[in-house]
């Protein structure tokens, strides 16, 4: 398409320089319109990808325990969360459709104005004997050959922006640094005691774990009981070193968790799922 545009512009310039210069001067108007629309599509696609990821995460965490959720008092709360997530995706997709519905008419309007301006200028040149009618006819034929490639290029630009917006999170994940599995200390003793001191965890401005302090001794079995979403799995993930976004201190036989590398700490734990 780009090659077709360049070749057509060369032929148009050969036929008439004045009309071609006018056409080239009006192309930036098209670019000015396309760039904001492309950026809007990028933002909308990024929001759509994020909303879909949240919905997938929600379902993957809830469907495995759906029977338990149905028997809890939080069932209606989960229904509201589910509806909110679905409604969010619907609103984002609706916004995307609205943007696309405006894109094509705006493109056609700009092209129509350009063609009308070229015809008007061509008529003026013919009236003043600065251009022959045959040249004008040939110019119009080549002009219509350039329209479809320009439309295809603009559509390609918006699709590229949509793709960038959709894959934005994936690109950010790929840029995240890998875990450095180094050894800080050698701990060969059997664990006798774990101390949890003033542990807090917040997610999305919501306090999940609030100032928990525990002493866990060897040889005892501890049950963590609570309603769905109260932070049971989060606490286990923190203790196993799978979640580091918390405040507070965790000690293993008086040794602070920070003295261990992630690799060493995780080797001290066995995580057995309910399944």
Swiss-Prot record:
GO terms for cellular component: plasma membrane. This is Uncharacterized protein in epiA 5'region. Pfam families: ABC_membrane (PF00664), ABC_tran (PF00005). PROSITE patterns: ABC_TM1F. GO terms for molecular function: ABC-type oligopeptide transporter activity; ATP binding; ATP hydrolysis activity. The chain crosses the membrane at residues 21-41, 106-126, 137-157. It is found in: Cell membrane. SUPFAM superfamilies: ABC transporter transmembrane region, P-loop containing nucleoside triphosphate hydrolases. It is a multi-pass membrane protein. It comes from the Bacteria. Residues 1-162 form the ABC transmembrane type-1 domain. Keywords: Cell membrane, Membrane, Plasmid, Transmembrane, Transmembrane helix.
């Amino acid at each position: 398409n780009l090659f077709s545009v360049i070749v057509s512009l060369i032929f148009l310039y050969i036929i008439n320089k004045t009309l071609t210069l006018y056409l080239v001067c009006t192309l930036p108007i098209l670019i000015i319109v396309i760039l904001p629309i492309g950026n809007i599509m990028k933002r909308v696609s990024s929001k759509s990808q994020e909303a879909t990821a949240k919905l997938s995460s929600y379902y993957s965490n809830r469907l495995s325990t759906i029977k338990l959720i149905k028997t809890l008092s939080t069932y209606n709360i989960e229904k509201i969360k589910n509806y909110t997530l679905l409604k969010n995706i619907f609103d984002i997709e609706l916004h995307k459709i609205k943007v696309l519905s405006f894109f094509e008419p705006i493109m056609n309007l700009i092209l129509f104005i350009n063609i009308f301006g070229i015809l008007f200028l061509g008529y003026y040149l013919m009236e003043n004997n600065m251009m022959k009618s045959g040249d004008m006819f040939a110019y119009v034929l080549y002009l219509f050959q350039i329209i479809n490639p320009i439309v295809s290029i603009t559509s390609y630009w918006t699709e590229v922006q949509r793709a960038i917006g959709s894959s934005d999170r994936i690109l950010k994940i790929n840029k995240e640094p890998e875990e450095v599995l180094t050894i800080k200390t050698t701990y060969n003793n059997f664990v006798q005691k774990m101390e949890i001191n003033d542990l807090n965890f917040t997610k999305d401005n919501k306090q999940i774990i609030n100032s928990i302090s525990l002493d866990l001794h060897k040889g005892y079995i501890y049950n963590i009981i609570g309603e769905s979403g109260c932070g049971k799995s989060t606490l286990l993930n923190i203790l196993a070193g799978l979640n580091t976004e918390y405040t507070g201190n965790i000690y293993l036989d008086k040794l602070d968790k920070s003295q261990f590398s992630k690799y060493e700490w995780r080797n001290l734990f066995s995580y057995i799922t309910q399944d």
